[in-house]
């Protein structure tokens, strides 16, 4: 018996966040029936990304180069480091133009229940980077959740001789950065508090 490729495509699309069966079905039918060129471009771009995208050797951001464009940019403030949970948080902050320093991407947040430890988040690498790069200020831009707060607190407890602040203004309790508008994020960065 042959595979039902349409069904497989619909199932494959449901792995995307927020995409259920109905949305996946609409997307699949649109790509196959109305926009084959777009579908081919999507498939080629996705394949290229899967082959080429890696983590930056310095900040762990997703990039196609060993060192990302932000870490390579000498015009950025090399002494100010913003610690975020995910690459989407970097994109959200960058879209505001409100931060000119560099980043460290944890790729998650501490969660003992889920078995996510400081080592899983690269926190030992972060602490070595802060020391080695002579960082003067660390901005903790983790989500306003129990896990995000615990992650920020853990990092803060392990930092000495460096100014540490946490974004706060305008980020709702329980909120995640990727869902907050740019102006709110910019104000949160500007209104950060020392902890």
Predicted features by range, described:
Residues 8, 35, 127-195:
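Long C-terminal interaction/binding lobes of large macromolecular proteins
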Residues 7-11, 25-29, 40, 44, ...:
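Solvent-exposed alpha-helical segments within well-ordered globular domains of core cellular machineries
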Residues 17, 36, 49, 61, ...:
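Conserved phosphate/pyrophosphate-binding and hydrolysis machinery centered on Walker-type P-loop NTPases
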């Amino acid at each position: 018996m042959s595979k039902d490729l349409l069904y497989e495509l619909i199932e494959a699309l449901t792995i995307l966040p927020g995409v259920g069966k109905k949305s996946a079905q609409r997307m699949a039918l649109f790509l196959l029936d109305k926009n084959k060129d777009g579908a081919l471009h999507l498939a080629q771009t996705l394949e290229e990304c899967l082959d080429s995208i890696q983590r930056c050797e310095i900040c762990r951001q997703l990039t196609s180069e060993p060192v990302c464009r932000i870490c390579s940019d000498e015009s950025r403030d090399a002494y100010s480091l913003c610690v975020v949970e995910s690459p989407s948080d970097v994109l959200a902050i960058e879209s505001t133009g409100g931060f000119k320093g560099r980043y460290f991407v944890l790729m998650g947040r501490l969660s003992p229940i889920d078995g996510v430890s400081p080592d899983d988040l690269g926190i030992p690498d972060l602490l070595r980077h802060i020391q080695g790069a002579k960082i003067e200020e660390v901005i903790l831009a983790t989500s306003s959740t129990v896990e995000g707060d615990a992650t920020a607190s853990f990092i803060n407890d392990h930092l000495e001789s460096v100014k540490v602040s946490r974004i706060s203004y305008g980020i709702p309790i329980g909120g995640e950065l990727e869902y907050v508008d740019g102006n709110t994020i910019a104000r949160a960065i500007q209104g950060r508090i020392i902890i």
